[in-house]
Amino acid sequence: MAKRGYKLQEFLAHSANVNCLSIGKKTSRLFITGGDDYKVNLWAIGKPTSLMSLCGHTSAVDSVAFDSAEVLVLAGASSGVIKLWDVEEAKMVRAFTGHRSNCSAVEFHPFGEFLASGSSDANLKIWDIRKKGCIQTYKGHSRGISTIRFTPDGRWVVSGGLDNVVKVWDLTAGKLLHEFKFHEGPIRSLDFHPLEFLLATGSADRTVKFWDLETFELIGSTRPEATGVRSIKFHPDGRTLFCGLDDSLKVYSWEPVVCHDGVDMGWSTLGDLCISEGKLLGCSYYQNSVGIWVSDISQIEPYGIGSADKKECVEKILSALDDQSFDRIKSTPRRSSSPDYETKEIKNIYIDSTGGNSAVAHKSGSLSTPATSTGQAGDNKSLVVHSVVPRDSDIGKDSSDSGKESITFSKTKPGMLLRPAYVRKTPTKFDETKKQSVAVGYLKKSGLDGEKKLDTETAFDSEMSGRNPYDADDSIIKSITNKFEQALLPESPTDEAKCMLLKPPRVQRSPSTKYNEARWATSTDSGALDSKKNGLESSRDMDLPTGLRDDRGSNPCEEDIENKSISSRSERVLSPEKAGDELKSLESPGGSKESKSVKVVRGVKVVSGRTRSLVERFERGEKITHSEDKAASATVVHSSNSVEEEPLTASVQTVSMMPTQVMPVKLDQATNSTTVDVPVLSTRRTKSTPVRVMPVVLGRDTSMATDTPPVTSTRPDRTSATNLTSDVSGVTSKRQTRTSPAPVMPMILNQTTKMKSDEPSITSTWPDRTSATDLTSDVSGVISSRQTRTSPAPVMPMKLNQKTKIKSDEPPITSTRPDRPSATNLTSDESPVTSTRQAKTSPAPVTPVILNQRQTTNMKSDEPPVISTRPLRTSSARVMPVILNQASTTYDERPLSSSRSARTSPARIMPMKLNQADNMPSYEPPVALTRSARNSPARVIPVKLNQATNVTADASHIRSRQRFSPTQTLATPAVFDQVTDMTLDETTKTQQSSDILTQKEEPQISGREDDGDIWEILMRTHSEVLNTLQSRLTKLQIVRHFWERSDIKGAIAALRKLSDHSVQADVINILTDKTEILTLDLFSQLAPVLTGLLGSKTERPVNVSLEMLLKLVAVFGTVIQSTVSARRVVGVDLHAEERLQICQSCSAELQKVQKILPLLTRRGGLIARKAQELNLVLQTP
């Protein structure tokens, strides 16, 4: 037997190391090499001496290429210079300069007028040979470019880089079309299919991947080999791909992805591959020598001698069946030319869309005659059969060609399955017989058939193993002939065939162009084939119309259908809409008739048990909560059409009462507030931790009218009765032992306040620790009842400034203590509030209220009551946001009776801020809380009143102060105010830290209820987060629109109008690494954006702005200063005038920045360091 691969010759090519090599594709007899000796040598295969040595480079040659006519030679050097030679005239034609680093890849355009070059500077350049210059530069790779290929029609250029990415560029539009990112190593080789719109890529990650260039999908991948891929080349017939590895040669078919053969070659660094006259030529290099390697394709599967002999045998057998086979072929021939780029409609080249019995012609030729078609099928060894044969079955083991691997999928990344290769059903009788023989051979294994199956299996083994025809017995040929004759006879359909849908299974591809959508692939396990028969009956993804009959006028028999289903078992591709049914039949060995339910969640079809999306987890969490609600005992359900108004009183236990929660309210100028006749009970122990101030922001023009009910608390051993009556007054408290002054807080929010409401009630129930929430007010009220311990009513004091009027009609609040009585009757004008405290206390749970001004809330008849259930133990009080609008009228009618046991904790003070002309309605929700003995700190969410929007407030986004001196003036007061507020925010962190430390000392109760709180918070803000991210994405797309048109000035102008600090920071962060594209004009446009970012609430935009300003001032600072300070020149100079205006604009912005920098310095950290650095740069003359 002749050698399958051998070395033809080896010789010294250069006086220094060889760096690159390329074979001419026209004659496949010439090749060129480039080395460190600055030369490009031209060679003829078989001759040890060079035909020509091309000089001219002054640095090492890193890349070489032939044009399609083998007349021009292109070479790129390590200096970035590209030189073009004419081989026929032996002279240099052009020299191109433009790359900043070594030119690592060059390639000629198919039509010869252009060329492409890639460099280690990550830029891809297109050059015009006639104009001697660069006409386009593509930037997108993050590392150097290693290989370049033009599409056969010259419309696109594809580049592979060291960043593991393959990018497709449109030369006509001058932009990036798509990028493939599934490789895990540098790209080393690219090749296009000669007949299909298909791209193959070889990488150092030891895999070859096949990409559909119509839909930009990954359609197949080889399994990782032992070594990396160096060079790949499609066979001219398009059936197979020859893959040159570091030390061997592999032959793959791409549909399906099957490794047919492997040859150990022994070459070193493979430079290029070429196929000519049935021979595979490979040129490799090592140091300064070059080796030429030859492999006889006729000795390699699937082009081996055995395949040709079997072809002759099959032609004899099928000569009598040509007419029948031809009649059954109804489909059009497969497209054998490059697709038309002008058509906008994407045609799927892998789906046979014809009616009737589908049949697809082979890629290697046309379907001129049935004999030719079947001959090709025999020569190709029917790739469908290869994928059908299970590797664990007897057929695969007995075959001498058992080294073949049927690769249906592989993993490119953890957890990601590739789509299986696509299968084309060949309609010839020969292929049907082979499928039947596969099924028969498999049934023999189960003991369902007899001697006839043995003969058929032996015939199939003979074909697969590549034995010569004389090795096969006449009985084998007779058995195959008998099989064809039986197939031609009309047969009555079986019962199973009648009940089944009778259309051959067809491979379907998802229309989506995104690879990462849901796709499920079947495996090739032989053990699962028997279950497919049962699963196929109920499978809905087959899309088989009933009543389909073949050309003989009868339905196909059950055996034919079963064989077809088995043949398509391992290759069928499911679209996302049908994935659930297929997975059900695959995962259940018994062939369950029920398909998995596919439910739609927010417009996305989700397969239960497979997809773990965030939305599904939220939905599942809600279901669990509702299921637990059935076990709850105390629930309060109100009808959506009626609102009950009745006082609610919690059980009063004579233990110890927790102090009321104080919520200070600050009223600025011209505040008209009717009510605050507020009886306040404030009892604290002597040693207390500082209270935490939680802000409440109310917008302008808020009408405020409160009628606060009395609060009664009973404690053993200590009694205090306080009666407060205020008319523009503060509150004072007397006690016997030790008093500590509290902030000015004359407004009280009681947790048992009853309000009229059009909204339905919301009931929340816990087993053993119940909290019934009843909303019976115009906004909503909360009733939370728990066992043994109750949290006190929140008290919301108000600081009254100029022109503030408060009238109160509330009865006094009486608190009785047996041993230490203290009665106080106060009437004061803006007097301080005094509170009594007790030692070691933990903050009490707070029910926040969210107030909105200009939106009316009315849920009386539209929203049903909501009942939610929680686990047994809770560590914090449930936070219930309540929405208030301006038009709401509130009446407080519910008293509060609350009791608390042993250990008490002080209430957190929640300051409320009212701006000018605020009239605020009462919004106290009725709350009755009963808690168990040990209480942990409660989560607190503050209250916010917005002017025009109904937004859930977060503590981090609420501004509770307006602190800046009115005497301070600045060119940008808005930014200055923001910076001032943020600086003051930083100073309050030290005060809050003590609260946090005290909070940590308290016992923390953790359990499933904490997770429940987290889920509720996430669910509450989920849609808002999605809307925010969608808004940012839209804004970024606007900027990208200008960016893709290379309109940087337009992108910056759009960025100024967006006024979104997050988007601005993202774009400027990118510009920070591309300062070379910025000019003085762009700096003047960008400076206002940078100034605005300095007023951001978060650190990242400020850091990005400071970093960008440092770089820009370092580049343009001197120019701006010299231009602004220069004397005016007599005469007219338009360019000088324009430059002066730009510099004056930049100087004005830098002065604004310089005034803000001292405030940023106070914030400390990285911001302070950069601010000081920028301040020094700006102050330098």
Curated annotation (Swiss-Prot):
Molecular function as annotated in GO: microtubule binding
Motif (DWD box): 114-130
Listed GO biological process terms: microtubule severing; regulation of unidimensional cell growth; response to abscisic acid; response to salt stress
Broad class of the protein's primary localization: cytoplasm
SMART domains reported in the protein's UniProt record: WD40
Keywords of the record: Cytoplasm, Cytoskeleton, Microtubule, Repeat, WD repeat
Start-end of Basic and acidic residues biased regions: 530-553, 569-585, 998-1008
Localization per Swiss-Prot or TrEMBL: Cytoplasm, Cytoskeleton
WD repeat boundaries on the chain: 13-53, 56-95, 98-137, 140-181, 183-221, 224-264, 266-303
GO cellular component labels: Cul4-RING E3 ubiquitin ligase complex; cytoplasm; katanin complex; microtubule; microtubule cytoskeleton
Positions with biased composition (Polar residues): 365-379, 509-526, 703-739, 754-791, 822-841, 850-859
PROSITE patterns: WD_REPEATS_1 (PS00678), WD_REPEATS_2 (PS50082), WD_REPEATS_REGION (PS50294)
Consequence of gene loss (knockout): Hyper-induction of abscisic acid (ABA)-inducible transcription factors (e.g. ABI5 and MYC2) and their downstream genes in response to ABA. Increased sensitivity to ABA and salt stress leading to reduced root length and increased dehydration tolerance.
Region described as Disordered: 361-383, 503-597, 702-739, 754-869, 988-1008
Tissue expression pattern: Expressed at low levels in siliques, flowers, leaves, stems and roots.
InterPro entries, alphabetized: G-protein_beta_WD-40_rep, Katanin_C-terminal, KTNB1, WD40/YVTN_repeat-like_dom_sf, WD40_repeat_CS, WD40_repeat_dom_sf, WD40_rpt
Complexes and interactors: Component of KTN80-KTN1 complexes composed of a hexamer of KTN1-KTN80 heterodimers that sense microtubule (MT) geometry to confer precise MT severing. Interacts directly with AAA1/KTN1. Interacts with subunits of the CUL4-based E3 ligase complex DDB1A and DDB1B.
HAMAP family reported for this sequence: Katanin_p80_B1
Entry's family note: Belongs to the WD repeat KATNB1 family.
Function recorded in the entry: May participate in a complex which severs microtubules in an ATP-dependent manner. Microtubule severing may promote rapid reorganization of cellular microtubule arrays. Confers precision to microtubule (MT) severing by specific targeting of KTN1 to MT cleavage sites such as crossover or branching nucleation sites. Together with other KTN80s, regulates cell elongation by modulating MT organization. Negative regulator of abscisic acid (ABA) responses. May function as a substrate receptor for cullin-RING ubiquitin ligase 4 complexes (CRL4), a family of E3 ligases involved in protein degradation.
Listed name of the protein: Katanin p80 WD40 repeat-containing subunit B1 homolog KTN80.2
Originating organism: Arabidopsis thaliana (Mouse-ear cress)
